[in-house]
Amino acid sequence: MEKTNVRELQDVVIRFSGDSGDGMQLTGTLFSDTSALLGNGISTFPDYPAEIRAPQGTVAGVSGFQVHFGSHRELNPGDYCDVLVAMNPAALKANRKWLKQGATVIIDGDSITEEHLKKAGFATLDPIAELGLDEYNVVIPDITSMTREALKQTGLDNKAVVKCKNMFALGICFYLFDRPEAYAYKYLETKFARKNPVVAEANKLAIDAGYNYAANTHQFANTYTVSPAPLEKGTYRTVNGNVATAWGLCAAAEKAGLPLFCGSYPITPATVILEELAKRKDLGVKTVQAEDEIAGICTAIGAAFAGNFAVTTTSGPGLSLKSEALGLAVMTELPLVVVDVQRGGPSTGLPTKTEQSDLSQALYGRNGECPVIVVAASSPSDCFHYAFEAGRLAMEHMTPVILLTDGFIANGSEPWRIPSMKDYPAIQPPIVDDAPEGGFMPYVRDEKLARGWAFPGKVGLEHRVGGLEKDCVKGCISHDPANHQKMVSTRAAKVAKAADDIPAQTVWGDPEGDLLVVGWGGTRGHLQNAVDQMRAEGKRVSLAHFNYINPLPHGVRDIFAKFRRIVGCELNEGQFANYLRQNLQEFRYEQYNKCEGLPFTVVELKEKFESLLK
């Protein structure tokens, strides 16, 4: 079908929104995956309600999926949307504040009933006027009715037919943005064809019906194209942060030549890592779904003692429960990676929302002097790299490492260039195969201060580990004051020495200027976009973004000294800023903090930076 009034855009933000059962996550995923296959840069933001099943039709039960796709790499899912697809009035109301001026709004006309409007908290029967959308491009197709009409010959009951209405909405968006239907068709055939081919065919018919509706209605004045992004040559796929983390851990095990063991307890939003690792039996991965968080980490510690690359995964509440056993891993000096996918807290908090509020817990949340290496990933795709790095540091330095991600990058997705494992270095743990002359001494150390890793069952390498303090050489239990002081200092020095084994800190932008923006972890995309926009306006603003938290990389002091002002931006109340004050006391740190369960927006960051430059 030939299209007229086609406009080319650099980037577009679409949000699909509806009840939890409306299939918005699948709709957004199919649209974003299709865009990725067309070569667009993409960044996504799945947004789930915190309740398992909030009351249907209420604002509390709204589920959303935001897609930012463009003709260049997209670093974040966008602040405000160009297009909102709302399956009911509650979705319209919940997302009103996220609309760009003049945005296109598509809402299912069948859902605009007195009952639905009352559930959503509207005071009138005209949601468009009540929300001030008269100047917006509002399209109100009867999506549910047209889906029923399109599928009336399938033989499916009404409940099954109505479940396909999200695919009708997807078809509309495919037409508007010149997306082919082929990938979505293939996905549906793969998912349903064997077990329920009628459902697969019904969903395909719904996509086609939505596409044809959009093509034949006069309510869409324009259609749009978005050119592919220039990408480095290679093989790409879309990946979310949890899956990338699992694969990075598998890669670390492969490069170390050791089996991977994961002992974990399911917890939102980290469970997908355990599920993905459980699929990798072909790579020799062993997983245990333990009865609780404590059992999960303790099985991992036992696996590390037995010669495995050991991992446990969790979120903030689970990290609290693992704290005593994490101290045991520090005392035994066994390699262990703890992946903490941060969520809103404290306590149960906001299980499906993002936050960066576990940093202080990761740094200090254990009894005694108990330092660990702390690493943080910045995007869905680089979760692979930093999971690999966490494994490398844990095994080569014989210490636990906490890898911090968060709900935003764990569930979000973006294109990922699949690396060649030849580009990754071999991981060389200090494994002891034979007893040295004079006998094996478990706490004799190498140049990194790492002790030898001797596996059970080898003659002459018998030794004990445990939570009681050990002699600094022989490893037997010791309560000697001088020995305890030495071991405390040595464990701290070992973690500090890891700074020699990580990249020096870098700056995005000029090496000196009026304002240095400091961030860490999953906020990088928003911070970098804000800094780039200000630099384009002639402002002397740069970004120092941290992935290695403890120890801090070399070069930080020299970088900070070259800027007039420093502002730390975090999705917490200033935990990294306080950590910097502790370690680099000569600098003054401004703060911009947010604890709303949402990522930063570029707009609010720029407003803060502008105020600091006045």
PLM feature segments, named:
Residues G78, L133-Y136, I140, T144, ...:
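Conserved thiamine diphosphate
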Residues V12-D19, A169-G171, L260-G263, A310-T313, ...:
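Short glycine-rich or small-residue beta-strand-to-loop segments that form or flank ligand, phosphate
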Residues S20, I143-M146, K152-D157, G171-F174, ...:
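Peripheral docking tails and interdomain loops at the edges
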Residues M1-A256, H554:
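Active-site cofactor/cluster-binding pocket
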Residues D11-K100, W247, A252, L260, ...:
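Thiamine diphosphate
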Residues V239-G248, A256, Y386, G391-K614:
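Flexible, low-complexity linker and terminal segments
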Residues Y48-P49, L188, A206, S227-L231, ...:
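A glycine-rich phosphate-binding loop feature that marks nucleotide/adenosyl-phosphate handling sites
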Residues A50, E149-L151, Q219-G234, A252-P259, ...:
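Gly-rich Lys/Arg/Thr-decorated short loops/hinges at beta-loop-alpha junctions or inter-strand turns
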